[in-house]
Amino acid sequence: MVSVINTVDTSHEDMIHDAQMDYYGTRLATCSSDRSVKIFDVRNGGQILIADLRGHEGPVWQVAWAHPMYGNILASCSYDRKVIIWKEENGTWEKTHEHSGHDSSVNSVCWAPHDYGLILACGSSDGAISLLTYTGEGQWEVKKINNAHTIGCNAVSWAPAVVPGSLIDQPSGQKPNYIKKFASGGCDNLIKLWREEEDGQWKEEQKLEAHSDWVRDVAWAPSIGLPTSTIASCSQDGRVFIWTCDDASGNMWSPKLLHKFNDVVWHVSWSITANILAVSGGDNKVTLWKESVDGQWVCISDVNKGQGSVSASITEGQQNEQ
């Protein structure tokens, strides 16, 4: 059984939509309909407010930490159609960049693996996905995938930089030939896989169809070097699917139904070793799932938060969400 190790009183004045631990598990970022982003030091079970970031003009849906090799950087996205990138300099958090290239709510932000540099994917209700790449001296290059999802994009998640099968296939000392990929989920009930071509343009590689309602979240599992790629998806239809691909071409994906919940499922998140999946939904519960030896997914923990958002507490099983 997973126990709650800390409960953080964020003092947000409205619903909390996301809560993310940083790389080291010492800082917690939260965002809310009160238009604010807050950062807490949560070491040793404490909760010290480090920053209260104001810059959005609408509900803030999601936050994402960049890899610490680039400093303390946090991205946030909002109903106000903006993405803001915040950076800590000399102990003070400030806005370092604002992206206003979408025509509707920006629902999801996700940093690429650090091996690629500072690249942020952003999914919007206008149906487009934008990719922001830091080019140095405060400048960001923007690429846009228009009409990525009809009606809107709800979630983006990068594939790991580790090449599938590299643990057993990669010649010693040879640098892997990385191919940038990410997954997206949208209001067209689809999961789409995208890859960067040699000319730098992004191409739709695959459509994954299984959900019967809006896809609310997608999460590409971390790679541990084995020759399998795995993606989790969840939907307004209450279902969570685990998608696996074993072939080198990356074209043959097979879905397995993890569970059919009685309410919308908002988020899915992998443990850092990719063997446990956290699922949170409209029933105010976080459930943890693990694949058994016979290939079936079983619930190993059911944490009922009672009243309030499921994002407001941190459990041991979710600390390595990033």
UniProtKB/Swiss-Prot annotation:
SUPFAM superfamilies: WD40 repeat-like (SSF50978)
Modified residues (N-acetylvaline): V2
Keyword field: Acetylation, Cytoplasmic vesicle, Endoplasmic reticulum, ER-Golgi transport, Lysosome, Membrane, mRNA transport, Nuclear pore complex, Nucleus, Phosphoprotein, Protein transport, Repeat, Translocation, Transport, WD repeat
GO cellular component: a single term: COPII vesicle coat
Subcellular localization: Cytoplasmic vesicle, COPII-coated vesicle membrane; Endoplasmic reticulum membrane; Nucleus, Nuclear pore complex; Lysosome membrane
PROSITE patterns: WD_REPEATS_2, WD_REPEATS_REGION
Inhibition and activation profile: The GATOR2 complex is negatively regulated by the upstream amino acid sensors CASTOR1 and SESN2, which sequester the GATOR2 complex in absence of amino acids. In the presence of abundant amino acids, GATOR2 is released from CASTOR1 and SESN2 and activated.
Gene3D superfamilies (alphabetical): YVTN repeat-like/Quinoprotein amine dehydrogenase
Residue(s) carrying Phosphoserine: S184, S309
Membrane topology: Peripheral membrane protein
Signal peptide feature range: none
Superkingdom of source: Eukaryota
Annotated WD repeat ranges: 11-50, 55-96, 101-144, 148-204, 210-253, 260-299
Function text: Functions as a component of the nuclear pore complex (NPC) and the COPII coat. At the endoplasmic reticulum, SEC13 is involved in the biogenesis of COPII-coated vesicles. Required for the exit of adipsin (CFD/ADN), an adipocyte-secreted protein from the endoplasmic reticulum. As a component of the GATOR2 complex, functions as an activator of the amino acid-sensing branch of the mTORC1 signaling pathway. The GATOR2 complex indirectly activates mTORC1 through the inhibition of the GATOR1 subcomplex. GATOR2 probably acts as an E3 ubiquitin-protein ligase toward GATOR1. In the presence of abundant amino acids, the GATOR2 complex mediates ubiquitination of the NPRL2 core component of the GATOR1 complex, leading to GATOR1 inactivation. In the absence of amino acids, GATOR2 is inhibited, activating the GATOR1 complex.
Family: Belongs to the WD repeat SEC13 family.
UniProt subunit comment: At the nuclear pore: component of the Y-shaped Nup107-160 subcomplex of the nuclear pore complex (NPC). The Nup107-160 subcomplex includes NUP160, NUP133, NUP107, NUP98, NUP85, NUP43, NUP37, SEH1 and SEC13. At the COPII coat complex: interacts with SEC31A and SEC31B. Interacts with SEC16A. Interacts with SEC16B. Component of the GATOR2 subcomplex, composed of MIOS, SEC13, SEH1L, WDR24 and WDR59. The GATOR2 complex interacts with CASTOR1 and CASTOR2; the interaction is negatively regulated by arginine.
Protein name per its UniProtKB record: Protein SEC13 homolog
Organism: Rattus norvegicus
Species classification: Eukaryota, Metazoa, Chordata, Craniata, Vertebrata
